[in-house]
């Protein structure tokens, strides 16, 4: 693995009433990093830029030696966003496959099933039958199932019971 997992240089993002940055940050390999700030400070925006969900207006992101714009790089990460939305008629397995597909990750049904069992979830259960905490566990199972090099969590423990 590289000396750093992620390096952000001069990252800015402009919204109507808010400007993020410039942000310079390096995440050393093997580290655990938390972003702490007030509501609306731009933490989720920064994570979405890191993962290639949003684009910065300026600056560069080096993610695992590549660009978050590249599918091969995105396939190396596991992501849980607090605001992820899926239709309630989807089953847990359909949601997880969709999440893996969004990031280009290889689908590992055996690993996903093991995480579902560990978290007490049912792959065939419809999303509309899951509580918010159960949905977060589902997102976490999907993010972990392909053994990512980097795990990005956006408030992934808010409303989550212990596992």
Pin down the residues of each PLM region.
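Conserved ABC transporter NBD signature motif
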Residues: 51, 59-73
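Conserved catalytic motifs of ABC-family nucleotide-binding domains
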Residues: 147
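The feature captures the beta-strand-to-loop junction immediately N-terminal to the Walker
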Residues: 36-38
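Short, conserved post-Walker A segment of ABC-type ATPase nucleotide-binding domains
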Residues: 33, 44-53
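Catalytic Walker B motif of ABC-type/P-loop ATPase nucleotide-binding domains
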Residues: 151-155, 160
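ABC-family P-loop ATPase nucleotide-binding domains
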Residues: 83-138
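Conserved beta-strand
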Residues: 8-11, 18-28, 59
